[in-house]
């Protein structure tokens, strides 16, 4: 039986030894084993995410828009396969799984469009006499790594609903 491990920084995490069987809801039979993530594996994932954040925190709105549009393109290009996986994973009917795969791409595109609206504000700071004639401004900037736990019942949609806004902002 195949064994799935965590995928961190373009590589599989080292096996911990502990795993559990994934049982397909369609036939109630084990399909593959899933490696349990140890504290070390989780720490490695957080460190990898932090490293990626440091490399990308100065990304432009255009870059973030491009990333989100690429996410939508990848979801659309793989929609049929993703729908099959959703069916196997949670036992959804294919029609619902197809809808979910498409909805993830739509949400990513919506977030890409929203990035273009992330303008700062110019704020007068003349509440104090020394601020007369002066202005401050606000700007949206990334602040760090996001951890998200996604429920099982809509794996693509709920993941994208957490991932895309984090990439957008």
Regions found by a protein language model. Name each.
Residues 8, 34, 42, 46, ...:
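Hydrophobic aliphatic residue packing
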Residues 163-169:
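Conserved short alpha-helical elements in the N-terminal third of ANL/AMP-binding
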């Amino acid at each position: 039986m195949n064994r799935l491990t965590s995928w961190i920084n373009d590589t599989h995490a080292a096996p911990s030894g502990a795993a559990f069987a994934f049982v397909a809801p369609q036939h109630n039979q084990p399909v593959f084993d899933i490696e349990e993530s140890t504290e070390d594996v989780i720490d490695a994932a957080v460190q990898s995410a932090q490293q990626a954040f440091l490399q990308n925190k100065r990304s432009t709105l255009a870059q973030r828009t491009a990333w989100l549009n690429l996410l939508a393109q990848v979801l659309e290009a793989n929609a049929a396969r993703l729908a099959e996986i959703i069916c196997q994973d949670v036992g959804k009917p294919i029609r619902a799984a197809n809808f979910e795969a498409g909805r993830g791409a739509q949400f990513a595109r919506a977030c890409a469009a929203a990035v273009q609206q992330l303008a700062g504000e110019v704020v007068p700071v003349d509440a104090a006499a020394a601020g007369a004639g002066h202005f401050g401004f606000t700007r949206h900037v990334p602040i760090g790594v996001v951890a998200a736990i996604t429920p099982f019942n809509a794996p693509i949609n709920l993941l994208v609903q957490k991932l895309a806004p984090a990439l957008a902002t």
